[in-house]
């Protein structure tokens, strides 16, 4: 009688382990065919940008990165002002650099030091 109970217990243990295995593989391979739709990345399409460029109303300089209308190219704003800092390099040119976690003005200070050969 005790061997019969042990056998039944072993079978129940095996069945529960097998159930757990199948649930693992079901989730791993797409939930048994019930996969959720994920949004896909938008493919690169220059026609969309070109149409926005063509429809922009500007009689001065149209910034290529932001489509802002400004008087001079070095007045163009950075595309991501909350994480980028605009640094004017002189001769009417400017670049946008990532702050990289530095405080305000630190990125421009590092660029200036690099231009002087001190960094």
Swiss-Prot record:
Signal peptide interval: 1-20
Task: Please provide the record's keywords in A-Z order.
Answer: Signal
Q: Would the keyword Signal turn up in this protein's UniProt record? A: yes
Keyword Signal listed: yes
One biological process term from GO is: ERAD pathway
Annotated function: Probable component of the endoplasmic reticulum-associated degradation (ERAD) pathway.
What is stated as this protein's family in its record?
A: Belongs to the LCL2 family.
UniProt protein name: Long chronological lifespan protein 2
> Which organism was this protein described from?
Aspergillus terreus (strain NIH 2624 / FGSC A1156)
Organism lineage string: Eukaryota, Fungi, Dikarya, Ascomycota, Pezizomycotina
């Amino acid at each position: 009688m005790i061997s019969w109970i042990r056998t039944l217990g072993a079978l129940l243990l095996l069945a529960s382990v097998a159930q757990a295995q199948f649930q693992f593989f079901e989730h791993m391979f797409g939930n048994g065919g019930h996969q959720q739709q994920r949004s896909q990345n938008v493919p690169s399409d220059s026609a969309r940008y070109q149409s926005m460029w063509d429809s922009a109303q500007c009689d001065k300089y149209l910034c290529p990165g932001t489509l802002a209308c400004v008087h001079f190219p070095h007045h163009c704003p950075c595309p991501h002002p909350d994480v980028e800092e605009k640094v004017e390099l002189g001769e009417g040119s400017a670049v946008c650099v990532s702050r990289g976690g530095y405080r305000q003005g630190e990125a421009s200070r590092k660029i200036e030091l690099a231009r002087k050969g001190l960094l």
